[in-house]
């Protein structure tokens, strides 16, 4: 642990890493935070995290780039509400970080994760709305309950314990923080997007469905078999030899 950063696993050569970012709004002693995930396969693992309430938005992109570079140039998805847009622009245009994830606004279909291609309706990160937050929190619940996301950090567990339902949304209790939880929510939204599945070759929803089907089948009583002797070859003067061959008498009509 150093200056707000905690490393749980050092980077390995081949895995795909994803960094999700929640930028402080500058109020109520808010934290700027990001989490680095090993997204190579499910269950996903948290390999590093950063959380600091003193860092300035103008300096934050340098820390984000340094750690993301360290983890095989991790794919970065930033929440661009408020000051997040400034951080995303700095990463893309000033620091020229290549692996920024872009999101496309698709009208009624909402926001869709994409690559790094600019165009109409594209933005350098995820704009957190009621819709995306609802999808993200629902996916996060499913990932945790099905053991598809391993959480090994005390600060994250602490924030999850105070992350409550309020009206039709979820947020931290009065006086608590949810910066790290929002990084989890962003990742959970991301993990169910088609582009993410193509990027990592992991369909976690399909795996969860298969696991559920296997559990149902395991709980079912096995099918029984009834031997009524009607199709028994030995009941028709036939028999099996020691080698497993079936011998039966040959029947034929007179004159054939």
Where are these regions (language model features)?
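Intrinsically disordered, low-complexity segments enriched in polar/charged small residues
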Residues: 111-113, 132, 138
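Acidic, Ser/Thr-rich peripheral helices and adjacent loops at domain boundaries
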Residues: 124-134
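RNase H-like, metal-dependent nuclease domains and their acidic two-metal-ion catalytic environment used
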Residues: 1-104, 134, 138, 142-256
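A generic structural motif
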Residues: 48-52, 99-119, 123-124
């Amino acid at each position: 642990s150093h200056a707000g950063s905690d490393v749980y696993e050092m980077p390995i050569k081949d895995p795909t890493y994803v960094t999700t970012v929640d930028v402080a709004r500058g109020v109520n002693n808010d934290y700027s935070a990001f989490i680095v995930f090993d997204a190579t396969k499910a269950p996903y693992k948290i390999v590093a995290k950063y959380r600091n309430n003193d860092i300035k938005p103008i300096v934050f992109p340098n820390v984000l780039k340094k750690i993301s570079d360290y983890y095989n140039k991790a794919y970065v998805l930033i929440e661009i509400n408020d000051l997040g847009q400034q951080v995303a622009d700095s990463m893309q245009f000033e620091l020229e970080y290549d692996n920024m994830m872009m999101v496309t606004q698709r009208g009624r279909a909402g926001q869709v994760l994409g690559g790094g291609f600019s165009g109409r309706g594209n933005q350098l990160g995820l704009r957190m709305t009621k819709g995306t937050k609802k999808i993200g929190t629902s996916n996060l619940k499913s990932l945790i309950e099905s053991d598809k996301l391993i959480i090994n950090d005390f600060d994250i567990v602490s924030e999850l314990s105070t992350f409550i339902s309020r009206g039709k949304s979820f947020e931290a209790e009065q006086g608590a923080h949810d910066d790290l939880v929002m990084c989890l929510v962003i990742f959970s939204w991301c993990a169910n997007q088609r582009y993410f599945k193509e990027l990592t070759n992991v369909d976690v929803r399909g795996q969860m469905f298969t696991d559920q089907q296997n559990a149902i089948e395991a709980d079912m009583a096995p099918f029984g078999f009834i031997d009524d002797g009607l199709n028994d070859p030995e009941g028709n003067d036939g028999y099996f030899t020691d080698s497993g061959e079936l011998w039966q008498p040959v029947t034929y009509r007179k004159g054939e």
